[in-house]
Amino acid sequence: MTEYKKVIAQNKKALFNYFIEERLEAGIVLKGSEVRSLRQGKASIEESHAADTRHEVFLYNCHIAEYEKANRFNHATRRPRKLLLHTKEIKKIIGRIRIKGYTLVALSMYFNKKNKVKVELGIAKGKKLHDKRESIKEKDWKRDQSRLIRQK
């Protein structure tokens, strides 16, 4: 059974720059003008990451554009946003992040079937330069294989 997801933003760089070891879903605390802006698709999570602060997890560097029809009570575009997770999940994430080399990266932001905004997070380990080159070669080889198969 496939789940309904209306994708707002994706972080394609994260898949290239990190080895994603585990994926999880989290809710996010937003203001009304932020939700309206997200419905228009005006968000970017290219440079965003999550970190723990006093047993809570926050999403940093996520850009949600200002809603142009909002009045003077508009939101700040790059403010830290609290992620909604269960206590067990938070403890598990904090335990994994504290290990050297691991980070929590936002992979995608979407509306679920109940029209709630969700963020897909990945517990990731950074790639070295030679790993990135290897993944580029692998990608090119798969592309060449599909071309060869189509030509036959």
From Swiss-Prot:
Gene for this chain: smpB
Any Pfam family hit: SmpB
UniProt similarity note: Belongs to the SmpB family.
GO cellular component: cytosol
Reported function: Required for rescue of stalled ribosomes mediated by trans-translation. Binds to transfer-messenger RNA (tmRNA), required for stable association of tmRNA with ribosomes. tmRNA and SmpB together mimic tRNA shape, replacing the anticodon stem-loop with SmpB. tmRNA is encoded by the ssrA gene; the 2 termini fold to resemble tRNA(Ala) and it encodes a 'tag peptide', a short internal open reading frame. During trans-translation Ala-aminoacylated tmRNA acts like a tRNA, entering the A-site of stalled ribosomes, displacing the stalled mRNA.
UniProt cross-references to NCBIfam families, sorted A to Z: PRK05422.1 (NF003843), smpB (TIGR00086)
Example GO molecular function: RNA binding
Keywords annotated in UniProt: Cytoplasm, RNA-binding
Subcellular location(s) of the protein: Cytoplasm
HAMAP family: SmpB
Signal is among the record's keywords: no
Organism: Rickettsia conorii (strain ATCC VR-613 / Malish 7)
InterPro entries on file: SmpB, SsrA-bd_prot
Protein name: SsrA-binding protein
Biological processes, Gene Ontology terms: trans-translation
